[in-house]
Curated annotation (Swiss-Prot):
Transmembrane feature ranges: 60-80, 163-183, 201-221, 239-259
Family from the record: Belongs to the CemA family.
Pfam families noted in UniProt: CemA (PF03040)
Protein name: Potassium/proton antiporter CemA
Name of the gene encoding the protein in the UniProt record: cemA
GO cellular component, one term: chloroplast inner membrane
Membrane topology: Multi-pass membrane protein
Length: 278
């Protein structure tokens, strides 16, 4: 890597905010450079740096996404899956990891039995003997048992594979100092290059998704699926407590960020945001 490239990227990536908004300062600096005699060579130099930043950032982003995913899937299929399946099937008699799985299984079995009786009563199914009904219920119970055994083993595999993928991701972040600086500079340039309307639109979209009026339903779905993914009990009190506190904290942090940082960097974007949000 050339030294001029790294120095340029590092200065841009860790540039501090001053009393003058960065959008105004960057515009004035750009106008000043265009008046200099060697402005043409500097423009070519900046274009090369920008092209290098874009290519390097995209490669690093692809690396951050694909490598942990590949590690996750490979370890889950080739390492954890055979070991856990062998241990669970041969040495473990339990079907469920938690009470939430039991409640769902019992509810499905009860609904299946009620469906059989309902179809017989309305004439959609021919009358069945109690022995036949018990046999169908038993087959359904065996099917549910196999399903929840698979769900339990998958949850353990998911936990171990995700931990390994997280360690891989953290290692890539920890060892990618130069790439992180380039990526940060690229993201800054990408954000500052957006129009004020686009910035305000993204801010409103982000806040409405994560801390908006309807965000509680989304958080509930995410938490339930996350707990189920790792085989943890779906505690409704814990879920509702999280929904009642975390979006509020996130909204407070976001408003502080607008007041403390974005108002200095791009005050016009903040003004546009307030106008669009009214």
């Amino acid at each position: 890597m050339k030294n001029w490239r790294l120095n340029n990227v590092t200065e841009s990536a860790f540039e501090k905010t001053g009393p003058i908004p960065r959008s105004i300062a960057k515009t004035f600096e750009k106008f000043k450079k265009e008046l200099e005699p060697n402005s043409e060579s500097e423009i070519i130099e900046e274009f090369r740096v920008s092209r290098y930043q874009t290519a390097s950032s995209i490669k690093y982003l692809v690396l951050l996404v694909t490598v942990p995913l590949l590690i996750n899937q490979a370890s889950k299929s080739l390492v954890f899956s055979p070991f856990i399946d062998y241990f669970w099937n041969d040495n473990q008699s339990d079907i469920f990891l938690n009470e939430s799985q039991e409640e769902r299984a019992f509810s499905e079995l009860q609904r299946f039995e009620e469906k059989i009786h309902f179809e017989i009563l309305i004439g959609q199914s021919p009358p069945l003997s109690q022995e036949t009904i018990d046999k169908e219920i038993k087959n359904k119970a065996i099917e549910l048992a196999q399903f929840y055994v698979q769900e339990s083993t998958d949850a353990i595999k998911n936990l171990l594979a995700d931990i390994l993928a997280f360690i891989t991701f953290a290692y890539l972040i920890f060892t990618g100092g130069r790439q992180i600086a380039v990526l940060k500079s690229f993201i800054n340039e990408l954000i500052y290059g957006l129009s004020d309307t686009a910035k305000a639109f993204l801010i409103i979209l982000f806040t409405d998704i994560f801390v908006g009026f309807h965000s509680t339903h989304g958080w509930e779905v995410v938490l339930e699926n996350g707990l189920r993914h790792f085989g943890l009990p779906e505690n409704r009190d814990l879920i509702f407590l999280f929904i009642a506190t975390f979006p509020v904290v996130l909204d407070t942090v976001f408003k502080y960020w607008i007041f403390r940082y974005l108002n200095q960097v791009s005050p016009s974007a903040v003004a546009t945001y307030h106008e669009m949000n009214e």
